[in-house]
Curated annotation (Swiss-Prot):
Catalyzes the reaction of cyanate with bicarbonate to produce ammonia and carbon dioxide. The active site is at R103, E106, S129. InterPro entries: Cro/C1-type_HTH, Cyanase, Cyanate_lyase_C, Cyanate_lyase_C_sf, Lambda_DNA-bd_dom_sf. This is Cyanate hydratase. The gene is CYN1. Its EC number is 4.2.1.104. GO terms for biological process: cyanate metabolic process. Pfam families: Cyanate_lyase. Belongs to the cyanase family. GO terms for molecular function: cyanate hydratase activity; DNA binding. Keywords: Lyase. It catalyses: cyanate + hydrogencarbonate + 3 H(+) = NH4(+) + 2 CO2.
Length: 163
């Protein structure tokens, strides 16, 4: 028997998530599907797909069709649940309490000004978009057999306008 790690959701620990989250995660759990498998069927990146599950990304009409197919959810129900606009940024308390999410916050806390300085030197005065943005997570194993998480952020550079 293979060891499959699947992300699940205890909705009682996440009261700020939309109703769609419970429906999506239940179907994901029932079908024993990883975000990688679901994303492959939907035709999106696995982080973008997971963001839909957490109510942090907007699902397109095609995403809804494909999610309904792969998860076995009624299309009409899913279209109703995912038809609105995401209410981003409310899903976790701040600062985050989950250790992994806190470490991501800690990375920005510790290296944020260094990132900013290097980006300003490379691009000038501006910001990296989180709207024209993509991200991915990869697993890398070094020569000693240690696993490493490789997280890539790719955001369009937006220079500040002079006015």
């Amino acid at each position: 028997m293979s060891n499959i790690n699947l992300a699940t959701l205890d909705i009682s620990e996440h009261p700020n998530l939309p109703t769609s989250s419970a429906v999506l995660f239940k179907a994901k759990d029932d079908k024993k599907l990883s975000f990688e498998k679901i994303a492959s069927h939907v035709g999106r990146n696995e982080v973008a797909t997971a963001a839909i599950f957490y109510g942090q990304a907007k699902a397109s009409a095609e995403d809804i069709v494909r999610l309904a197919e792969v998860l076995g959810i009624d299309h009409g129900q899913l279209a109703f649940l995912l038809g609105g606009f995401p209410d981003r940024g409310k899903s976790v308390p701040f600062p985050p309490k989950d250790p992994l999410i806190y470490r991501l916050y800690e990375i920005v806390q510790n290296y944020g000004y260094a990132y900013k300085a290097v980006m300003n030197e490379k691009f000038g005065d501006g910001i990296m978009s989180a709207i024209s943005f993509s991200t991915k997570v990869e697993k890398e194993t070094d020569k000693d057999g240690n696993d490493w998480a490789v997280v890539t952020w790719r955001g369009k550079w937006l220079p500040y306008s002079r006015f």
